[in-house]
């Protein structure tokens, strides 16, 4: 749709003309579906007129600018927002013909685990359901290039596209740790692609505006650090996997982050202050650590102690460690920590 808008040089007068032509041909009122409409200047004024005339309108787009304050003011209270994410694991299973009931852990466990291995590595974009093997990675690579050159480089008139690509790779390599603007600028510049901190800030905003990535703030930090020292995650595991040689642990945390972001939105944080907890929900009193395995004694001690120490400092009732395949209950004094494999957590918490 966006290519059509660009080629035709559309504006709101063209949209009004399409509406008039329809009304001359048909007597019943249409339902409007406007895809990637943000390409059309002042599109929100056209949509406001439709809403005032009691038309039903669906507007979709892949840029967060659609939700800016100016547009919200023009539309008034005449809209509801629905974020669309890649398939959840349950949706992915359903699309592959796997239907789960309350006893699925006994009936479908092996089938669920087999499908999860593919979902984990290639993500939940619907088009991948019809791709096989290596075709999945080729399709993901083509999709990323389309987003990179179309939604990023062309839309924002980026001249230093190689620096942007290096930044994306560095963010992928750093997906489990906070990254300050200065650190990212130094990482990119160290590859020979000189870049300023201000440009890094612009590029990060572009990546979030186009839904390639999202960020989490540190609940325990001061306001200035909340803004400048965030953790960055990719909206889909498949895109992240394109940039990693050994992706397992990063994919695990990224998948948990996407799932929690979908469920809790802006209420989701990480917690870093004298301890490191991957995900923290103040409103739900939840704390979640992500660890590929707890078999190493030092890893187990680190992950468990971080949750217990957090529980001493803030109100938290639900303590959880999400692993790749391990499951148990850890009891420490009055606190119980659930250890759950990610594929089960995805389905139990959704169901």
Please provide the spans of the model-predicted regions.
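Conserved ATPase-coupling elements of RecA-like P-loop NTPase cores
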Residues: 10-12, 38-47, 69-70
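Interdomain motor-coupling "hinge/lid" segment immediately C-terminal to the ATP-binding subdomain
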Residues: 64, 69-178
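Conserved catalytic/switch belt of AAA+ P-loop NTPases
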Residues: 44-59, 73
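Accessory nucleic acid-recognition modules appended to NTPase machines
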Residues: 129, 133-287, 292
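Nucleic-acid nuclease catalytic cores
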Residues: 272, 314-333
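Conserved P-loop NTPase "ATPase switch" module shared by AAA+ and STAND
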Residues: 26-41
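Short, small-residue-biased leader/transition segments that mark boundaries at the very start
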Residues: 1-5
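Domain-level recognition of nuclease-like catalytic cores that cleave nucleotide substrates
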Residues: 325-351
């Amino acid at each position: 749709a966006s290519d059509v808008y660009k080629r035709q040089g559309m504006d709101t007068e063209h949209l009004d003309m399409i509406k008039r032509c329809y009304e001359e041909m048909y007597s019943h009122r249409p339902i409007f579906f406007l895809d990637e409409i943000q390409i059309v200047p002042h599109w929100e004024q056209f949509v406001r007129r439709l809403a005032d005339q009691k038309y039903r309108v669906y507007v979709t787009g892949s840029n967060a600018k659609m939700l800016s304050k100016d547009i919200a003011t023009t539309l008034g209270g005449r809209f509801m927002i629905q974020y669309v994410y890649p398939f959840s694991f349950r949706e992915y299973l359903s699309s592959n013909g796997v239907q789960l009931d309350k006893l699925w852990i006994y009936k479908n466990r092996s089938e669920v685990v087999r499908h999860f291995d593919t979902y984990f590595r290639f993500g939940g974009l619907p088009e991948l359901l019809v791709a096989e093997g290596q075709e999945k990675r080729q399709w993901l690579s083509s999709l990323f290039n389309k987003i990179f050159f179309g939604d990023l480089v062309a839309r924002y008139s980026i001249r230093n596209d190689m620096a942007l690509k290096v930044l994306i790779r560095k963010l992928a390599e750093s997906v489990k740790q906070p990254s300050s603007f200065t650190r990212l600028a130094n990482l990119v510049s160290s590859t020979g692609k000189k870049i300023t901190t201000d440009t890094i800030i612009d590029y990060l905003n572009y990546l979030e505006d186009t839904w390639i990535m999202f960020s989490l703030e540190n609940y325990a930090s001061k306001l200035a650090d909340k803004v400048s020292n965030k953790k960055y995650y990719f909206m889909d595991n498949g895109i992240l996997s394109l940039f990693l040689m050994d992706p397992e642990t990063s994919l695990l945390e990224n998948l948990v982050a996407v799932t929690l972001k979908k469920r809790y939105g802006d209420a989701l944080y990480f917690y870093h202050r004298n301890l490191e907890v991957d995900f923290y929900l103040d409103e739900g009193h939840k704390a979640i650590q992500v660890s590929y395995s707890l078999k190493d004694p030092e890893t187990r001690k680190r992950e468990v102690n971080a949750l217990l120490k957090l529980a001493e400092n803030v109100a938290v009732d639900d303590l959880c460690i999400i692993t790749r395949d391990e499951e148990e209950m850890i009891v420490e004094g009055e606190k119980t920590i659930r250890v759950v494999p990610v594929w089960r957590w995805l389905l139990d918490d959704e169901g």
